[in-house]
């Protein structure tokens, strides 16, 4: 079953205008979209998703005149708004980052290190390289870098060397459990978390360009949102959250150069573009009991001035 994490908190913090225009940057199974639509009267919602399964689900279950689903990465939101004359007209954006429960639970998608399936990991199966192909094509140094930076894996080089050696001997790694067991054999189980967790996260981020897409969205988000509009971001790991926090913070407290003569910071409020609505919120105990995956979720909400 799919749970939308921090659902009520994020929707409440968006302060929905019933006549407004909203964007769900990560449709998934439509939990946040449904909650927004329930609060709209003459307003409308545009949702984005790279996953064809999510697109099919939306077309079958969200047949509303004020709803549109777009098969695209949220990195293309600016271009979409430009093409449809919506720049500066969006009342709110919600983004629920990372992989969804249906993607994790379906072994055939290749995201799970506990259920065997093809080592794919693409959110959009219509294009791009699979995780299996990435392991074959990347050098030891590149693979090590991905594990270290995207997965924060301290044994990155050791795992990368073992993987490339295994591929040289066996031709490829085609199954998720094949990779998970290889990682376990390389570094052992030293903590409660599955030893494959970080490498699977890193590979998924690389295959789907997740952090680059997030940076592209945030780079242009001010041009999309209207004054008084709000942005809600839910992240599930420190890399995503760091990007969100740093971007929001830079627009709330912009770094300014000291005046060389007065040695004082210029008081230029025009450089301040956002204000915090929710600096940091986490799932409460009731939600944690319902959905263990919500334990790492962090919600941050800002408003455009």
UniProtKB/Swiss-Prot annotation:
- Binding positions for S-adenosyl-L-methionine? 30-32, 49, 74, 96, 103
The protein's matches in Gene3D superfamilies, at most eight in alphabetical order, are given as: Putative methyltransferase TM0872, insert domain (1.10.150.170), Vaccinia Virus protein VP39 (3.40.50.150)
Highest taxon above the source species:
Bacteria
Question: Keywords for this entry?
Answer: Cytoplasm, Methyltransferase, rRNA processing, S-adenosyl-L-methionine, Transferase
Molecular-function GO terms, alphabetical = rRNA (cytosine-N4-)-methyltransferase activity
Where in or outside the cell it occurs: the entry states: Cytoplasm
Presence of keyword Nucleus = no
Per the record, what is one GO cellular component? cytoplasm
- Main function: Specifically methylates the N4 position of cytidine in position 1402 (C1402) of 16S rRNA.
| Family assignment from sequence similarity | Belongs to the methyltransferase superfamily. RsmH family.
HAMAP family assigned: 16SrRNA_methyltr_H
Q: What is this protein called?
A: Ribosomal RNA small subunit methyltransferase H
Name of the coding gene: rsmH
């Amino acid at each position: 079953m799919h749970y939308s994490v921090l659902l009520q908190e994020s929707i409440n913090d968006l302060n929905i205008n019933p006549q407004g225009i909203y964007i769900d940057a990560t449709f998934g199974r439509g939990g946040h979209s449904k909650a927004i639509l329930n609060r709209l009267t003459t307003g409308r919602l545009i949702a984005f998703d790279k996953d064809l399964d999510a697109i099919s689900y939306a077309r079958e279950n969200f047949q509303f005149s004020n709803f549109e689903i777009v098969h695209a990465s949220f990195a293309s939101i600016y271009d979409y708004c430009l093409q449809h004359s919506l720049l500066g007209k969006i009342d709110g954006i919600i983004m629920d980052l990372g992989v969804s429960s249906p993607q994790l639970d379906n072994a055939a998608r290749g995201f799970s290190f506990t259920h065997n399936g093809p080592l794919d990991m693409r959110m959009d199966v219509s294009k791009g390289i699979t995780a299996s192909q990435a392991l074959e094509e990347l050098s030891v140094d590149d693979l090590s870098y991905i594990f270290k930076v995207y997965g924060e894996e301290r044994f990155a080089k050791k795992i990368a060397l073992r993987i490339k050696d295994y591929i040289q001997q066996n031709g490829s790694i085609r199954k998720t459990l094949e990779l998970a067991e290889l990682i376990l054999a390389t570094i052992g189980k030293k903590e409660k978390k599955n030893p494959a967790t970080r490498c699977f996260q890193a590979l998924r981020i690389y295959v789907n360009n997740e952090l680059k897409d997030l940076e592209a969205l945030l780079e242009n988000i001010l041009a999309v949102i209207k004054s008084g509009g709000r942005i809600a971001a839910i992240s599930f790991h420190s890399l995503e959250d760091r990007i969100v926090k740093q971007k929001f913070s830079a627009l709330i407290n912009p770094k300014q150069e000291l005046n060389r003569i007065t040695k004082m910071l210029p008081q230029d409020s025009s450089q301040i573009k956002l204000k915090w609505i929710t600096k940091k919120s986490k799932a409460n105990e009731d939600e944690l009991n319902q959905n263990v995956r919500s334990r790492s979720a962090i919600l941050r909400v800002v408003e455009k001035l």
